Structures are given as structure tokens and as C-alpha cells.
Amino acid sequence: YINTGAFPYATRFVDNSLAHSQYLEGIYNTVLVKDVMMRENLKDITLVKSLASFLASNVGSPVSAKKIADTLTSNGRPTGSATVDTYLEALTDAYLFYKVNRYDIKGKMHLKSESKYYICDTGLRNMILGTTNKDIGHQIENIVYLELLRRGYTINIGKSGRGTEVDFVAIRDKKTEYYQVSASVLDESTLERELTPLKQIKDSYPKFLIT
């Protein structure tokens, strides 16, 4: 699942990596052209692909339109943050990516700082990046996000203390749950780093570490 994703028909090609990649590429290109470019009346397919590649590479990492625009500009493609905002909205409207905002757990308010993005399918991410071994930790984090979304939770990134955050604050039926996700916590310092944000939360809602 981490490598191939969850499109039902794609399971026919688990033993044929080329056919699997071609199938996912067909879905990807159809979404970009019909659901992103045509529906939103956008003109720059190269920019859309650049943004999709950037978001796929930075799944689970804080990003902003300005940060992306600066990166594109430094790579020789001058782009304004307003343009990036428009194209990012188109990618999320097409449900190719999901935007997750940050939430101050103590202050109980949404923050206007950098958001995180998660892709709709891990197989698509691997196809876009051309690899199946790109940052397993964020792959697992992406999978947990999609499962929480499937179960009907409203999801935010939680600020739990000074310089610390919880991967997911999941709310459903007026009940809150907190989730930390890590590829491995065998190292004691990693375990402590993952548990610290949960320990800083003073309420009695359930808190989970998934690894």
C-alpha cells in the first residue's frame, strides 16, 4: 500500500511496475488537465506540475505560498506568491492534495502560519517523485492523515508548546484525539521527541503515538 497506493484497479499491476506507473500517470494527467487546468481556467501546465512535484516532495512539511514562490524563483522560474496561491487552491479543489492548517491547542484558535499538504494517494506520490523509498516517515504520516479523513475527522496540525507540535488534532462528534506519527521510535531520543508534544497537552482527550 505504501508503494502502490489505493486505487482499486491499480492492484492489477502490482507485479508490473511499468504498467502500474503508466496507469497512475494517466490518472494524474487527467486530473491535472480536466480538474485543475480546464475547470479553473489556468494556463500554465508547467507551473501546475512544478507545484504538484514540490508538494509531493514536501508532504507533511510546513510550506507557504511565499516559500514555494521563493523556491521556484531561486530555481530560475520567477513566480509570485499570489499566483502560487491560485494554483495551490486549484490542486486542493481537485482533491489531488489536502491542505491542513495549524491550530493552537492551548489558545484554541487557528493559526495563519505555514500549512501542511498531504497527497490523495501514496502511489501517485511515488509516481510523481519517481521513487518508492522517499521519506518513509512522511509516507506513513500521509497514510494516517488519509485514514483519519476517511473516518470523518476534521483534522488540524496542533501547536502544543513552544517549538513543538502534534502531527494531527482530530475532531469528530465534538470529541478530540491527538496523534503523533513516526517511522520508528526504537531510538530513545526519538521516542522522547515524539512523546513530548503529547505530554504538553493538559486535557484528558486520548493521545496516540503511531509507529
Model region roles, listed by residue range:
Residues Y1-F7:
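Conserved P-loop NTPase motor "coupling/switch" region that bridges the ATPase
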Residues N3, D15-N16, D187:
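Serine/threonine-rich low-complexity intrinsically disordered regions
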Residues A183-T211:
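Catalytic cores of nucleic-acid endonucleases
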